Design a protein with these regions (language model features):
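Solvent-exposed alpha-helices and their adjacent loops that cap or buttress functional pockets
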Residues: 22-25, 79, 97-100, 117-120, ...
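Short gly/pro/ser/thr-enriched loop/turn and capping motifs at secondary-structure boundaries
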Residues: 92-97, 134, 162-165
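Glycine-rich beta-alpha loop segments
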Residues: 1-88
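C-terminal functional extensions of proteins
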Residues: 157-160, 167-210
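Active-site/ligand-binding-proximal alpha/beta "capping" segment
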Residues: 109-161, 207-210
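Short glycine-rich anion-binding loops that position phosphate/pyrophosphate groups of nucleotides
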Residues: 35-38, 91-93, 130-134
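Acidic/glycine-enriched connector segments
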Residues: 69-128
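Short, solvent-exposed amphipathic alpha-helical segments in soluble enzyme
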Residues: 49, 79, 141-145, 171-175, ...
Length: 210
């Protein structure tokens, strides 16, 4: 192993160690994914704020990627509700900035470690509209659930006007035309909803806050 790889390995170990030490006493919460580019005027920004506020009032720790846009709305909602508002940020050369509405936060160098803790610290996944980063996070959770690498959890996509075409593509291309996922996988692993009431009902059906 060369010096560069040794340094990289040391840094990876340190990030994992710091994450476990920082969050070891936290209950499993709800992780909410979404775009860093969502404006405060967007209906989804307002919905994400309302959802996280209500979840925090119900006792759920709320997690986001710790940045701006939907992530800021998520953290601000939980923060304003005086709940546990966790932000797991990432160092990027542009676009990603820490928001100030967290009760506990950490900034990562490595995406895969950040994604590990966003999964490890959560027991349910909510996916608001977003781009490639949001879809990467959503697909990872779907894959982990399908392959039984994580315990059963709800994965909830928010906004039929945004995600309906994605669900249709899964059905038409993945299930029917190519059979690259099981015919019942979509129904089994993914939920598509519009309202926060639907989200909270799904969460309540899987066993409470802890």
């Amino acid at each position: 192993m060369n010096k560069v790889d040794k340094k990289r390995l040391k840094r990876i170990k340190q990030e994992f160690s710091d994450g476990f030490r920082l969050f070891t006493l936290y209950d499993k919460g709800v992780v909410i994914f979404g775009s860093a580019r969502t404006s405060p005027e967007s209906k989804y920004y307002k919905q994400a704020y309302d959802l996280s506020f209500r979840l925090a009032k119900l006792g759920y720790p709320v997690l986001s990627g710790g940045g701006m846009g939907t992530m800021k709305a998520v953290n601000k909602g939980a923060y304003d509700a005086k709940g546990k508002s966790i932000g797991l940020n990432i160092k990027l050369p542009h676009e990603q900035f820490n928001n100030k509405y967290t009760t506990k936060s950490m900034t990562f160098n490595y995406f895969f470690i950040r994604k590990f803790f966003l999964t490890y610290l959560s027991r349910a996944t909510v996916v608001f509209p977003g781009g490639w980063g949001t879809m990467d996070e959503a697909y990872e959770h779907l894959t982990l659930l399908q392959t039984k690498k994580i315990k059963q959890r709800p994965i909830i996509f928010v906004g039929a006007d945004y995600y309906k075409d994605v669900f249709n593509w899964w059905e038409d291309v993945l299930v029917v035309k190519n059979k690259t996922i099981g015919e019942k996988d979509i129904q089994k692993y993914a939920n598509l909803v519009n309202s926060n009431e639907e989200i909270i009902a799904i969460l309540n059906n899987v066993g409470g806050k802890k």
